[in-house]
Design a protein with these regions (language model features):
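Basic, flexible Lys/Arg- and Gly-enriched helix-loop patches that mediate nucleic-acid binding at interfaces
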Residues: 14-254
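Methionine residue identity
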Residues: 1-2
Length: 254
C-alpha cells in the first residue's frame, strides 16, 4: 500500500494543487504552523514573488525558503536526537549560539516535533515528513512526553498533588491538564505531559515556588531515550518497526 506521504508527492507531481503551508511541511522544512510563520515573515517566495497566505502550488512552481529551493521527497525518515543544553530549538536565529539544525549536521532537511528550551536537554524526534510532525504536535491527540526534573526545593506531597491535578498559569492564561507525576528523589520527579505549553514545566514549578535546576525529556510517545546509547548532540535513525508504530499512534497511514 502506498503511504500517505508518497500519495501527496504523487498527486503533487501530477499537477494537483496543494496548499502552500502543507507543501512546505511535506518537504520536511517545518510543521504547517511554523510554515505559516515563515510565510508571514516574508521568508517564502513562489516563482520569485513573495508568498502570501492561502495560495496553492503545483510541481510547476518554484518554492524557496530563505533563498533555498525546497522539493518534496518520497523517502521519509525519523531520527531520535539528544539535544544538549545550550542548543536552541529553531530553524534559523542569528542570535542563537547554535541551533538544533547546526548541531545535528544531518544530510537531509529535517525539523523537530515539540521544542525543548535552550536550558533543557533530551529527546527530540526529527523528520523530513511535515505531516508526521504536524500530527505529533496536535494537542488534541494528547501524545505523551515524559521528563526527568530536578528542582531547588524539596518535592512534597502537596507539590506533587498540585502538579498532577493541573494548575492555572496566569502568564499564559491557560490551565494545564491533569498529568502523571512521580517523585524520584528528595528534589526530583518525573512528569508525563499530554500538552505542550511554552516552558510549561518551568512555569508550573515556578508557580509553586520552585526553580528548575535540570530538565531532561526522556520519552516522546513510544520512543524512549534510554533505548538508544545516545550522548548529547548525537542522533540515531529510527528503525522501520519503531517508525511504523509512531505513525500508527500519530494517526497517519504508512
Amino acid at each position: 500500500m502506498m503511504n500517505i506521504c508518497s500519495t501527496f508527492t504523487l498527486l503533487f507531481r501530477l499537477g494537483i494543487f496543494m496548499r502552500l503551508n502543507k507543501y512546505i511541511a511535506s518537504c520536511g522544512v517545518c510543521s504547517r504552523r511554523e510554515a505559516d510563520k515563515l510565510i508571514d515573515e516574508g521568508r517564502v517566495t513562489i516563482n520569485g514573488e513573495k508568498a502570501v497566505f492561502g495560495v496553492d502550488v503545483t510541481d510547476t512552481d518554484s518554492v524557496f525558503v530563505d533563498g533555498k529551493k525546497i522539493e518534496p521527497s518520497d523517502e521519509k525518515i525519523v531520527i531520535a536526537y539528544y539535544k544538549p543544553v545550550g542548543v536552541t530549538c529553531t530553524e534559523k536565529d542569528k542570535y542563537a549560539e547554535k541551533t538544533v539544525i547546526e548541531d545535528l549536521g544531518f544530510d537531509k532537511r529535517v525539523t523537530y516535533a515539540g521544542r525543548l528550551d535552550k536550558d533543557s536537554e533530551g529527546l527530540l524526534l526529527m523528520s523530513n515528513d511535515g505531516e508526521l510532525i504536524n500530527a505529533m504536535m496536535k494537542g488534541s491527540m494528547k501524545h505523551e512526553k515524559e521528563y526527568e526534573v530536578t528542582v531547588d526545593t524539596d518535592v512534597t506531597g502537596d507539590f506533587l498533588k498540585a502538579m498532577s491535578s493541573g494548575m492555572y498559569l496566569k502568564e499564559l492564561d491557560r490551565r494545564t491538564r491533569a498529568c502523571e507525576v512521580k517523585k524520584t528523589g528528595k528534589r526530583s520527579f518525573n512528569i508525563i505531559l499530554t500538552q505542550g505549553l511554552n516552558r510549561q514545566i518551568r512555569r508550573m514549578c515556578a508557580a509553586l515556588g520552585a526553580n528548575v535546576v535540570k530538565l531532561k525529556r526522556i520519552r516522546v510517545m513510544n520512543v524512549k531515550l534510554k533505548d538508544y546509547d545516545l550522548k548529547p548532540g548525537k542522533y540515531v535513525v529510527l528503525s522501520e518497526q519503531v517508525v511504523k508504530k509512531l505513525y500508527k499512534d500519530a494517526g497517519i497511514a504508512r
